[in-house]
Amino acid sequence: MSVLRALPRVARVVRPAPPSLRSISTTNTIFKSPTADPFPLPFSDPELAHANNSLPSNSEEWPLPEPLDRTGEDEKTLRARLIYQTRKRGTLETDLILSTFARDELPNMDFEEMKQFDKLLDEPDWDIFYWSVKKRDPPARWKGTPLLEKLQKHAKNEGKVVRMMPELMQKEPDL
């Protein structure tokens, strides 16, 4: 009983916090619309904050970035770029398949085959992976092409070879 008498009574009315201490989520007057950016960048265009930048719900309808125009690229530069692009894609599975394929097939490719391989590398990583392991049907532009058939055969790995990322330079460059 003495413990209850020692506790102070909390019988006063709780008042709301002053506006300066309220959280942003309770302050509806700051935002003009529910889609407005609550944290705009300092020098950003205010029109961009109100733009509708929604993507379609189906990921296959998303716009792909346009590949860079590489007209006038010589064969040596193209070959070096293809070696780099097959190694540094960002998806380990695709990197292993493409880099070992490039190690085995790129030295024997002519310029037109390398340009076609370059166009294949412009496709999304997971699409290339699923086409090469035959989990999805490739689109009409790639279906039945000799390049994709070679890639599918390489990905099948009939010899059950343990694949690792190949060395970047297999021989000293000619200077």
UniProtKB/Swiss-Prot annotation:
Pfam families: Sdh5. Belongs to the SDHAF2 family. Residues 42-71 are annotated as: Disordered. Residues 51-60 have a biased composition (Polar residues). This is Succinate dehydrogenase assembly factor 2, mitochondrial. It is found in: Mitochondrion matrix. SUPFAM superfamilies: YgfY-like (SSF109910). The keyword Chaperone applies. Interacts with the flavoprotein subunit within the SDH catalytic dimer. InterPro entries: SDH (IPR005631), SDH_sf (IPR036714), SDHAF2 (IPR028882). It comes from Cryptococcus neoformans var. neoformans serotype D (strain JEC21 / ATCC MYA-565). GO terms for biological process: mitochondrial electron transport, succinate to ubiquinone; mitochondrial respiratory chain complex II assembly; protein-FAD linkage; tricarboxylic acid cycle. Keywords: Chaperone, Mitochondrion. One of its GO terms (cellular component) is mitochondrion. The keyword Mitochondrion applies. Its main location: mitochondrion. This protein may be expected to contain an N-terminal transit peptide but none has been predicted. It comes from the Eukaryota. Plays an essential role in the assembly of succinate dehydrogenase (SDH), an enzyme complex (also referred to as respiratory complex II) that is a component of both the tricarboxylic acid (TCA) cycle and the mitochondrial electron transport chain, and which couples the oxidation of succinate to fumarate with the reduction of ubiquinone (coenzyme Q) to ubiquinol. Required for flavinylation (covalent attachment of FAD) of the flavoprotein subunit of the SDH catalytic dimer.
